[in-house]
């Protein structure tokens, strides 16, 4: 993770950091006063080495974000700061049960269980970690392995869902930026949104005004209901069934819809896109290239 973890290291051995800081500028604006000499501190990242997990404390390194290394950062002072930085990350790691994380930053590992997350950040979830309720604008940067989030509410966000990770239900304006691997979302409700599905990512059912912006590779949606929308389908993506007034705006390449019912609609089909069966009042507005509808059973 390129943005983990911003710190300012001071010449008195203290470390300035904040789990909600997204840049060194944030830390400087909040914690550095006009009385502080610019040479009394330096900007750095405390990050794991490439491809290492965030809980792998033995593989962290200090990456100095300056054009120079201060003369005072050496010897026992440098050693003490390294120990303190390790303790900062260690304090974030949750391995057991937590009833609530509030205004907090965490890394969930093993069989960790958090009942409720409010206005907090989870930098990563690994192994079999679980969150029951993600709420109040909380966010998770990376979810992988066989981790589970039971419910997403409010305007909560997951940046990346991968591996065999799963979200059971999305509500309100909750959002996932990218799904890949064999990750899964069971139910999307309200105005929930997924920006990108790749790999073998799967949505079981979409309802209400739920939306998926772009489907790639072999990702799949089992069922679309209500006024749910998919903006684009590419590659070998599949939608099994469309109902009600669900809509797909654009299909291309080898993408496929198996069955359409109710007043469901596809705006444009291009490439070799296919609808296997068009039923009831369902509609495809425009066909281009070799796109085709294989069977019609309209009312």
Residue ranges and their predicted role:
Residues 1-299:
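Short, glycine-biased loop/turn motifs at secondary-structure junctions and
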């Amino acid at each position: 993770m390129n943005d983990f973890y911003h710190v300012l290291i001071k010449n008195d051995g203290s470390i300035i950091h904040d789990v909600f800081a997204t840049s060194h500028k944030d830390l400087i604006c909040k914690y550095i006063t006009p009385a502080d000499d610019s040479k009394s501190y330096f900007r750095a990242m405390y990050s794991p080495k490439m491809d290492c997990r965030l809980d792998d404390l033995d593989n962290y390194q200090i990456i100095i974000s300056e054009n120079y290394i201060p003369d005072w950062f050496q010897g026992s002072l440098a050693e003490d700061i390294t120990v303190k930085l390790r303790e900062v990350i260690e304090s974030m790691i949750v391995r057991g049960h937590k009833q609530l994380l509030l205004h907090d930053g965490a890394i969930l590992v093993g069989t960790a269980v958090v009942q409720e997350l409010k206005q907090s950040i989870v930098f990563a979830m690994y192994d079999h970690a679980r969150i029951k309720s993600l709420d109040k604008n909380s966010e998770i940067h990376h979810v992988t392995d066989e981790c589970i989030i039971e419910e997403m509410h409010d305007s909560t966000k997951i940046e990346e869902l991968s591996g065999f990770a799963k979200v059971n239900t999305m509500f309100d304006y909750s959002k996932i930026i990218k799904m890949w691997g064999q990750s899964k979302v069971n139910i999307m409700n309200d105005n929930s949104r997924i920006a990108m599905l790749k790999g073998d990512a799967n949505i079981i059912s979409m309802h209400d005004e739920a939306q998926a912006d772009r489907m790639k590779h072999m990702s799949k949606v089992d069922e679309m209901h209500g006024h749910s929308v998919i903006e684009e389908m590419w590659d070998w993506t599949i939608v099994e069934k469309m109902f009600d007034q669900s809509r797909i705006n654009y299909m291309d390449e080898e993408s496929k819809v198996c069955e359409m019912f109710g007043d469901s609609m596809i705006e444009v089909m291009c490439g070799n896109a296919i609808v296997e069966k068009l039923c009831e009042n369902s509609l495809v507005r425009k066909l281009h290239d070799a796109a085709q509808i294989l069977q019609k059973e309209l009312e």
